[in-house]
């Protein structure tokens, strides 16, 4: 593939494996499209797909998968720990190779317009594609979630960019946009107290005075009897993963709580992991040029 765009659509289904297979199917066996990864979480009740491709075939595959999700998912029956406003909650496009951010923005707008036309879904443009500053942050767009969107969408400042100014009865609304790569990173705590997880999340996220380029929320993992700080690092080159990990560790100590593990959702840029490994190993003057795989791929 000469020109590569990444797309990481998030679907509000993490439990029904048959539905998950049907949603992922449009990304398989397509010329110019490669399915890199998909992961589902039962507690979050969410599916995250990572796919790359040439802009046009990728667009077609994404539109097909959205159609399957709209058909299969009824948010009136959906329960999960992760905030959601749509059956297809968010569809970000990330320029990877020989594609500019401006081209990724244009692609996101093309997909958004077609989603509204084809599936009668209200579409909000967010991040780099946002039509207004207050729509850049996904959390602001999604505030109120599926249930609250029935009234929110009627407000003048929250009219959708494409589609009807009315929440879809079963599929809700969707956010589509272009952005830089982010790292979805979850840190698990050995406490069942959701209040503690909430408090730690508030302390580490930027909006609460914490780390720049860090979004965080507290999540309960009922099946394991623990809680989690669920994090999005929106620019890992400016705020490294290890900074989030260490700050969570510091804040957790105040409650006599420790970290029992962490996980990365979806794929992660090599540089983000190498940066973290270099920090904990105390490397001096280390660079990507010393990584064997990086040199081979040049």
Name every feature range the model reports, one short phrase each.
Residues 1-298:
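Long, contiguous binding/interaction regions
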């Amino acid at each position: 593939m000469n020109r590569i765009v990444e797309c990481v659509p998030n679907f509000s289904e993490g439990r029904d494996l048959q539905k998950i297979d049907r949603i992922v199917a449009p990304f398989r066996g397509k010329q110019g499209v490669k399915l890199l990864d998909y992961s589902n979480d039962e507690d979050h009740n969410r599916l995250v797909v990572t796919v790359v491709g040439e802009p046009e075939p990728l667009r077609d595959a994404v539109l097909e998968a959205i159609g399957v999700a709209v058909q299969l998912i009824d948010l009136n029956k959906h329960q999960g720990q992760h905030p959601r406003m749509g059956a297809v909650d968010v569809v970000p496009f990330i320029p990877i190779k020989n594609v500019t951010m401006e081209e990724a923005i244009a692609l996101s707008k093309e997909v958004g317009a077609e989603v509204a036309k084809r599936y009668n879904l209200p579409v909000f443009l967010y991040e780099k594609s946002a039509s207004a500053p207050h729509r850049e942050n996904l959390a602001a767009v999604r505030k109120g979630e599926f249930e609250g969107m029935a009234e929110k969408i009627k407000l003048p400042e929250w009219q959708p960019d494409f589609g009807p100014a009315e929440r879809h009865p079963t599929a809700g609304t969707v956010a589509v946009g272009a952005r830089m790569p982010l790292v979805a990173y979850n840190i698990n705590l050995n406490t069942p107290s959701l209040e503690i997880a909430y408090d730690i999340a508030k302390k580490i996220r930027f909006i609460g005075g914490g780390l720049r380029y860090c979004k965080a929320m507290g999540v309960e993992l009922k099946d394991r009897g623990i809680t989690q700080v669920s994090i999005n690092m929106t620019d890992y080159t400016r705020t490294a993963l290890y900074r989030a990990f260490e700050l969570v560790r510091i804040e957790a100590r105040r409650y006599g709580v420790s970290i029992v593990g962490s996980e990365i959702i979806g794929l992660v840029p090599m540089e983000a992991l190498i940066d973290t490994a270099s920090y904990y190993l105390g490397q001096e003057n280390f660079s990507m040029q010393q990584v064997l795989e990086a040199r081979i791929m040049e």
